[in-house]
Amino acid sequence: MQQPFNYPYPQIYWVDSSASSPWAPPGTVLPCPTSVPRRPGQRRPPPPPPPPPLPPPPPPPLPPLPLPPLKKRGNHSTGLCLLVMFFMVLVALVGLGLGMFQLFHLQKELAELRESTSQKHTASSLEKQIGHPSPPPEKKEQRKVAHLTGKPNSRSMPLEWEDTYGIVLLSGVKYKKGGLVINETGLYFVYSKVYFRGQSCTNLPLSHKVYMRNSKYPQDLVMMEGKMMSYCTTGQMWAHSSYLGAVFNLTSTDHLYVNVSELSLVNFEESQTFFGLYKL
């Protein structure tokens, strides 16, 4: 069987994996020249088209993402605790500083007080040694007041009063023969209370008065007076009290007394019958 010569022989390709060519990449298939001589005037067939370029190699795999630090939350908590401790220490130091400042201030005041006391004591000692006595202390004004209570053995007029025992009081005022003697001019509140009682009521008129004696007046001057009538039921046991009190402008050497109409009916208990005054 003969093959027509107007057709070229099929081309044969060979691959040499060990040979390398500067014009072809490794593994390129090269055509093998045919051993059949070509005819005169026959065109050489065009070379085969170059093979398509190989795809680029795949990119290398990405490195694994770093894991988040496990102790980040713990570090935040630790930092917060340290900040709180810092503020606590700062507050403690500030308090300690304030306390030390107050202590220093108190010590300074105490030292100044001791120094002033020492200076006063030294000055007083020097005055005593030199012979200059210190000024006498100021005397407080004596309060003018008197409170006298009934005297059971009183048998005459004016009434006599207890001025020594019991709840009596005398200050800045003198007591003389049943009367209070004023030694300083001024406003005084004068008061007197007399307690009357009896086994059988006779409704005798009763009077109770406070009067004043002074050499400037020719006779006694009645200051206060109380009268009682129809104060009990006839034939029955009874008791009645009379109280007098008012403000007067008294002068020195005035003498005040108390008089009653029925001395035998007076109860002289200190809580029931009394006489007194005090300066306003």
UniProtKB/Swiss-Prot annotation:
Gene Ontology molecular function: any one: cytokine activity
Subcellular location as annotated: Cell membrane; Cytoplasmic vesicle lumen; Lysosome lumen
Positions of the THD domain: 144-280
One Pfam family cited in the UniProt record for this chain: TNF
Gene3D superfamilies on file: 2.60.120.40
Region (Disordered): 20-70, 117-155
Biased composition (Pro residues): 43-69
Intrachain S-S bonds: 201-232
Topological region Extracellular: 102-280
Residues the UniProt record annotates as site (Cleavage): 80-81, 128-129
A Gene Ontology term for the protein's cellular component: lysosomal lumen
PROSITE patterns from the UniProt entry: THD_1, THD_2
Annotated glycan sites: 183, 249, 259
Sequence ranges on the Cytoplasmic membrane side: 1-80
Membrane-spanning ranges: 81-101
Keywords: Apoptosis, Cell membrane, Cytokine, Cytoplasmic vesicle, Disulfide bond, Glycoprotein, Lysosome, Membrane, Nucleus, Repressor, Secreted, Signal-anchor, Transcription, Transcription regulation, Transmembrane, Transmembrane helix, Ubl conjugation
InterPro entries attached to this UniProt entry: FASL, TNF, TNF_CS, TNF_dom, Tumour_necrosis_fac-like_dom
Protein's UniProt keywords contain Transport: no
GO term, biological process aspect, one: release of sequestered calcium ion into cytosol by endoplasmic reticulum
Family recorded in the similarity comment: Belongs to the tumor necrosis factor family.
Subunit composition and interactions: Homotrimer. Interacts with ARHGAP9, BAIAP2L1, BTK, CACNB3, CACNB4, CRK, DLG2, DNMBP, DOCK4, EPS8L3, FGR, FYB1, FYN, HCK, ITK, ITSN2, KALRN, LYN, MACC1, MIA, MPP4, MYO15A, NCF1, NCK1, NCK2, NCKIPSD, OSTF1, PIK3R1, PSTPIP1, RIMBP3C, SAMSN1, SH3GL3, SH3PXD2B, SH3PXD2A, SH3RF2, SKAP2, SNX33, SNX9, SORBS3, SPTA1, SRC, SRGAP1, SRGAP2, SRGAP3, TEC, TJP3 and YES1.
Protein name: Tumor necrosis factor ligand superfamily member 6
Species whose genome carries this gene: Cercocebus atys (Sooty mangabey)
